Amino acid sequence: MEIRRSTEEVEENHVMQITGSNGIVHNMEFMPQAYLRNQYSSEIDIDEEFVSTYPLEDAPLPIFLKFEDVEYKVRNSHASSANLVKTMVSKVVTHTNPDPDGYKHILKGITGSTGPGEILALMGPSGSGKTTLLKIMGGRLTDNVKGKLTYNDIPYSPSVKRRIGFVTQDDVLLPQLTVEETLAFAAFLRLPSSMSKEQKYAKIEMIIKELGLERCRRTRVGGGFVKGISGGERKRASIAYEILVDPSLLLLDEPTSGLDSTSATKLLHILQGVAKAGRTVITTIHQPSSRMFHMFDKLLLISEGHPAFYGKARESMEYFSSLRILPEIAMNPAEFLLDLATGQVSDISLPDELLAAKTAQPDSEEVLLKYLKQRYKTDLEPKEKEENHRNRKAPEHLQIAIQVKKDWTLSWWDQFLILSRRTFRERRRDYFDKLRLVQSLGVAVVLGLLWWKSKTDTEAHLRDQVGLMFYICIFWTSSSLFGAVYVFPFEKIYLVKERKAEMYRLSVYYVCSTLCDMVAHVLYPTFFMIIVYFMAEFNRNIPCFLFTVLTILLIAITSQGAGEFLGASVLSIKRAGMIASLVLMLFLLTGGYYVQHIPKFMQWLKYLSFMHYGFRLLLKVQYSADQLFECGSKGGCRTLQSSSSFDTINLNGGLQELWVLLAMAFGYRLCAYFCLRKKISICHL
């Protein structure tokens, strides 16, 4: 690496030109940060010294983020005037909003900037607006946002979106996959198709090594009720998941929450390496240790949505010292700043004017916060705005480059092949769960024993066998309905995250999900019917047996589609279960067994019930209208059609029920897809 002075003017401004291995000259400010913006610079690249672990050709496009006067507000929930408790709660929640416009203001004029090689920490007490600002920077909140945000002086756009990585506070990783599988599937879905398989695996290996994930690479990620890797390892896996695609801007929401001090410091060292590779890193942080605090390049302190400090982190204490606001005892700088942001003045010395104001006004917290906001407005904000307007202009080639959308899109079929493998691998433990197998086969054996060698020679025996038919319909309707209704509510957070990152088309996800789940909805009913059919001695006719099995499969698949539709329409585990129970009860009562003669004003319900059509089709497949029974009675033989069990059913035909079930199976899935599309588009993590 060659370093040389460029011009006298540059020398005066402490600017150096750095020549990398690619021979391009780069202007950079001569400061400790790996990347700093230079008002005289027209070309920027990455210093080899800071990317020793990341190949230069894989370095991300530098992004200079500037944000000015950012405001965000949300509409207040209108409590019912009839409910006194809700009205009181609403008033308490919205007391901070003096504007009578029906909105609560979360962010109130945030200004700042950051660039490649820097870690910007957003710090403040809980509820101050840190995460909200982070989501706005990541393009995840767009409604009711005011102010100006630019990326290399270009507003947010879909092309910018592809260059942003977002690590949520809760690690959103599929729990049943191993760390290596998680990264591998992400690589094959997100990396360009121009990269070979060997290159993708090499990149995975490099990231696993750099983030210290070698020991847990073949361990399940875990989460919830699934045992897996530790919290620190899971957080590093989340970061690896994002930097796999070389994001230019990496946003992290509380990455150290839940970690001990050592793990948190180690994680921040990793983020320093990520930043030195040419990325812009922004993280929210609640209360870092003093060691971690000094690892930040820039700091934005937020108090009740207002900025209280913005600048270099190491200069924050000097700034407040200039205001004569000092800790009276040895104190962690982060703890001191958080006390200021919340208005706490214990063990903090204040200037005389503040002490006088405190004496005159009993609310000392408000006095301090108001003072900090005023000083920020007069001392810091004008300088930052002037720098952004005059000197911090992104080079033209970076402005052009960021508007080029990264062509990472695989074909629909390629996405389907990759995602179907991942879906099956994630859910295969549920598909072949021992309890599920015992339940299905155990119930089949019990039913076979209860209806052992059942007959249709008398009305009573026929009624018993028809009851078995209806129970089979109930069993596989409920099993398939409840097996599918929770799929999308459970996977909502994973789907929202991956859709925000544009990993795949929603249609690919839905088709993979429904086809992979169909494995269980086909295998278990098939084995179930093989056991019950021959133990109960149904019609011993091969075509009849095959059509009976196919009918049960059609009922199960239609029930699966209905469950997916109900789950996608609410995306809530609790509400999905309640709605599914109600629908199952209605379909069960109108299925044609308990009530054959439904009142006319209620008959419309049975036409919505796939159990009604499935039960009728099952009877038509199993029995023939001219089949004889009661031959030993005084009146002689009768046809099955004359039985009271079939008063409302014509045992001939069956095509109508078949087509209706097929239409329902397809229609429910179509409705589920569009409901899922609408719901996911408005969901936020």
Swiss-Prot record:
<dbReference type="GO" id="GO:0030638">
    <property type="term" value="P:polyketide metabolic process"/>
</dbReference>
<keyword id="KW-0256">Endoplasmic reticulum</keyword>
<keyword id="KW-0067">ATP-binding</keyword>
<feature type="transmembrane region" description="Helical">
    <location>
        <begin position="432"/>
        <end position="452"/>
    </location>
</feature>
<dbReference type="GO" id="GO:0042626">
    <property type="term" value="F:ATPase-coupled transmembrane transporter activity"/>
</dbReference>
<dbReference type="Pfam" id="PF01061">
    <property type="entry name" value="ABC2_membrane"/>
</dbReference>
<comment type="function">
    <text>Mediates the transport of sporopollenin precursors (e.g. polyketides) across the tapetum plasma membrane into the anther locule for polymerization on developing microspore walls, thus being required for male fertility and pollen exine formation and patterning prior to tapetum programmed cell death.</text>
</comment>
<dbReference type="InterPro" id="IPR003439">
    <property type="entry name" value="ABC_transporter-like_ATP-bd"/>
</dbReference>
<dbReference type="GO" id="GO:0080110">
    <property type="term" value="P:sporopollenin biosynthetic process"/>
</dbReference>
<keyword id="KW-0813">Transport</keyword>
<dbReference type="GO" id="GO:0010152">
    <property type="term" value="P:pollen maturation"/>
</dbReference>
<dbReference type="GO" id="GO:0140359">
    <property type="term" value="F:ABC-type transporter activity"/>
</dbReference>
<feature type="domain" description="ABC transporter">
    <location>
        <begin position="65"/>
        <end position="329"/>
    </location>
</feature>
<keyword id="KW-0812">Transmembrane</keyword>
<keyword id="KW-1003">Cell membrane</keyword>
<comment type="subunit">
    <text>Homo- or heterodimer.</text>
</comment>
<dbReference type="InterPro" id="IPR050352">
    <property type="entry name" value="ABCG_transporters"/>
</dbReference>
<feature type="transmembrane region" description="Helical">
    <location>
        <begin position="468"/>
        <end position="488"/>
    </location>
</feature>
<dbReference type="GO" id="GO:0010584">
    <property type="term" value="P:pollen exine formation"/>
</dbReference>
<feature type="domain" description="ABC transmembrane type-2">
    <location>
        <begin position="414"/>
        <end position="623"/>
    </location>
</feature>
<keyword id="KW-0472">Membrane</keyword>
<dbReference type="InterPro" id="IPR013525">
    <property type="entry name" value="ABC2_TM"/>
</dbReference>
<dbReference type="Pfam" id="PF00005">
    <property type="entry name" value="ABC_tran"/>
</dbReference>
<comment type="similarity">
    <text>Belongs to the ABC transporter superfamily. ABCG family. Eye pigment precursor importer (TC 3.A.1.204) subfamily.</text>
</comment>
<dbReference type="InterPro" id="IPR003593">
    <property type="entry name" value="AAA+_ATPase"/>
</dbReference>
<feature type="transmembrane region" description="Helical">
    <location>
        <begin position="542"/>
        <end position="562"/>
    </location>
</feature>
<dbReference type="GO" id="GO:0055085">
    <property type="term" value="P:transmembrane transport"/>
</dbReference>
<keyword id="KW-0547">Nucleotide-binding</keyword>
<dbReference type="GO" id="GO:0009555">
    <property type="term" value="P:pollen development"/>
</dbReference>
<feature type="transmembrane region" description="Helical">
    <location>
        <begin position="518"/>
        <end position="538"/>
    </location>
</feature>
<dbReference type="GO" id="GO:0005524">
    <property type="term" value="F:ATP binding"/>
</dbReference>
<feature type="binding site">
    <location>
        <begin position="124"/>
        <end position="131"/>
    </location>
    <ligand>
        <name>ATP</name>
    </ligand>
</feature>
<dbReference type="InterPro" id="IPR043926">
    <property type="entry name" value="ABCG_dom"/>
</dbReference>
<dbReference type="GO" id="GO:0005789">
    <property type="term" value="C:endoplasmic reticulum membrane"/>
</dbReference>
<feature type="transmembrane region" description="Helical">
    <location>
        <begin position="576"/>
        <end position="596"/>
    </location>
</feature>
<feature type="transmembrane region" description="Helical">
    <location>
        <begin position="648"/>
        <end position="668"/>
    </location>
</feature>
<dbReference type="GO" id="GO:0005886">
    <property type="term" value="C:plasma membrane"/>
</dbReference>
<dbReference type="InterPro" id="IPR027417">
    <property type="entry name" value="P-loop_NTPase"/>
</dbReference>
<protein>
    <recommendedName>
        <fullName>ABC transporter G family member 26</fullName>
    </recommendedName>
</protein>
<dbReference type="Pfam" id="PF19055">
    <property type="entry name" value="ABC2_membrane_7"/>
</dbReference>
<keyword id="KW-1133">Transmembrane helix</keyword>
<dbReference type="GO" id="GO:0016887">
    <property type="term" value="F:ATP hydrolysis activity"/>
</dbReference>
